[in-house]
A protein has these predicted regions:
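Alpha-helical transmembrane segments of multi-pass inner-membrane proteins
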Residues: 1-27, 31-155, 229-258, 262-269, ...
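Interfacial juxtamembrane loops and adjacent helix segments
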Residues: 23-27, 186-229
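Hydrophobic alpha-helical transmembrane segments in integral membrane proteins
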Residues: 151-167, 308-338
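Alpha-solenoid helical repeat scaffolds
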Residues: 328-329, 359-363, 392-399, 426-430, ...
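Register position in tetratricopeptide repeats
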Residues: 336, 370, 403, 437-438
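Short coil turns that delineate tetratricopeptide repeat
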Residues: 355-356, 388-389, 422, 458
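Terminal, low-structured helical/coil segments at or just beyond the last alpha-helical repeat
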Residues: 440-486
Length: 486
């Protein structure tokens, strides 16, 4: 882990200084990840391991006797301390640039705990409490005030981002309340979240800032809530108890670095999505096993062999999916260029391997919509709804029904889209056009949607919004002429 942390830290420094390219067009710093959030969380997880190694090796060096006949061991301890300390400094150089408040908090708390375990602060605190209780209370109260101030400053750093997380957790809790015992099933978070958010906004009892920060997330940005949504509260509590027991066992065995890494990941999981990435799952599993395993080399060898066998069985399927993703990227070029007929053949061929990916299903369904295969498009897009809460899926399904002449169904889907993300102007525009259809003309509803399109403040002004508003004004003129003729 220390070596991997060093590689990631150097990778990040090279990106910061322009010697390497990041994996995201919007961010300079991503390491080997796709955005700086998980990258910062990974570094924060490794930092307490480095601190533990540095403290341990440094202590062994200070306690060793120069003439104890173990000069080679002392040299290795020095090398280990230098490597751990060097990687720790590299991580500390890169971590602030990631701008991840969750990672900063995770790194700070976990490193403090590792240092406290090494210095045996528990016994010292107990003794101090017996001797100077009043002073301890003052220090604790002061520390609590400092934490509140730090929390406020972290909130002010990115206020809309913080509000967005809070709103996301609020909707997630509403989804949990619908199925608290059984959950919605693995990989069904997005569908559950989308329906819960749709129901919430449809009621109309919400604050303006909630409409502004609402989105269509793939993850809950809180692993505890996400597990509760997918597996139910009882199973989520059981899994948490297992992790806490492993952590307790690790502390009892003196494996402070490993326990610090687990604690860091647990804190980071409160406001991010690390366990949605395979690298975190594998590392987390290894850390938990390391807390329970003894010092016997045969146990570790057996563990390594078991992991290798499981990985071997997974490898074939993973390679097939990876190859399918590469071919999807090639097919996406055809899709983006408007060659929908050629793209459809590729998407149809890749469908069995990539049918669990929402973006793939949306592109496939949208391409079918462009080819006027409306029924087949709806079937694919309704599958995408089980994997995503993106309102654009609802919009395209509604347009399919409109093209098939089922205006009532189209209206229902467009209205669902306005409830799922009321801050978007596009579904109101689609409803306005629907109410202007000759066979479905409804002037009163058109006027209401027209006002929404023309007066609603978008998050970002764009050419598309200007064009929609101009078209609605033209449709309004047609309505005026029709009224005059009548």
């Amino acid at each position: 882990l220390v070596m991997l942390g060093g590689i990631e830290a150097v990778w990040g420094l090279r990106q910061l200084y322009g010697y390497a390219v990041s994996n995201h067009s919007l961010y300079v710093l991503t390491g080997s990840f796709f955005n700086p959030g998980p990258y910062s969380g990974y570094l924060a997880m490794i930092l307490p391991v480095c601190l533990h190694q540095w403290l341990t090796k440094r202590g062994e060096i200070l306690c060793s006797d120069r003439n104890d006949g173990k000069g080679w061991k002392k040299v290795m301890d020095k090398v280990g301390a230098m490597v751990a300390g060097g990687v720790m400094l590299l991580i500390l150089c890169v971590l602030p640039a990631g701008m991840s408040r969750s990672a900063w908090l995770a790194a700070g708390v976990s490193c403090l705990c590792v240092y406290a375990w090494h210095m045996d602060w528990t016994d010292k605190f107990r003794l101090l409490w017996q001797q100077q209780r009043q002073r301890v209370v003052m220090v604790v109260v002061g520390g609590f005030c400092v934490l509140l101030l730090a929390g406020y400053l972290l909130f002010v750093l990115k206020p809309d981002s913080a509000r967005g997380r809070l709103f996301m957790w609020k909707i997630t809790c509403r989804a949990i309340a619908e199925k608290p015992l059984t959950g919605y099933g693995i990989h069904n978070f997005a569908a559950a979240y989308g329906n819960a958010q749709e129901t919430y906004f449809a009621a109309g009892d919400y604050e303006p800032w909630e409409e502004r920060v609402a989105g269509s997330p793939e993850y809950a940005f809180n692993e505890y809530l996400q597990v509760a949504v997918e597996l139910g509260i009882p199973l989520a509590v059981c899994l948490l108890v297992v992790v806490v027991l492993c952590l307790y066992r690790g502390v009892r065995k003196g494996r402070y670095g490993i326990c610090g890494a687990i604690l860091s990941l647990m804190i980071f999981s409160f406001s991010s999505y690390p366990l949605q990435l395979p690298v975190f799952i594998v590392t987390f599993g290894g850390l938990l096993v390391a807390c329970l395993s003894g010092a016997d080399r045969w146990q570790w060898l057996g563990l390594a062999v078991s992991v290798g066998i499981i990985g071997g069985f997974r490898l074939k399927n993973d390679l097939q999916v990876e190859q399918a993703c590469r071919e999807w990227m090639n097919a996406r070029v055809l899709y983006s260029a408007g060659a929908y007929q050629s793209a459809e053949k590729e998407y149809g061929r890749l469908y069995p391997l990539l049918r669990d990916r929402a973006s793939f299903l949306f592109e496939y369904g949208h391409g079918l919509h462009k080819q006027q295969q409306f029924g087949k498009s709806n079937r694919i897009l309704k599958e995408a709804l089980l994997r995503s809460c993106d309102p654009m899926i609802l919009n395209v399904i509604g347009k399919n029904y409109q093209q098939m002449g089922d205006c009532l169904s189209a209206e229902d889907w467009f209205i669902r889209s306005t409830h799922r993300l009321p801050g978007r102007i596009y579904p109101y525009y689609l409803l306005a056009k629907l109410y202007a259809e000759p066979g479905f003309r409804q002037p009163d509803k058109f006027e209401k949607m027209k006002r929404m399109v023309l007066t609603k403040e978008p998050k970002v002004h764009s050419t598309a919004i200007r064009q929609m508003r101009e078209e609605i004004k033209k449709i309004q003129l047609i309505f005026v002429h029709i009224k005059k003729d009548e």
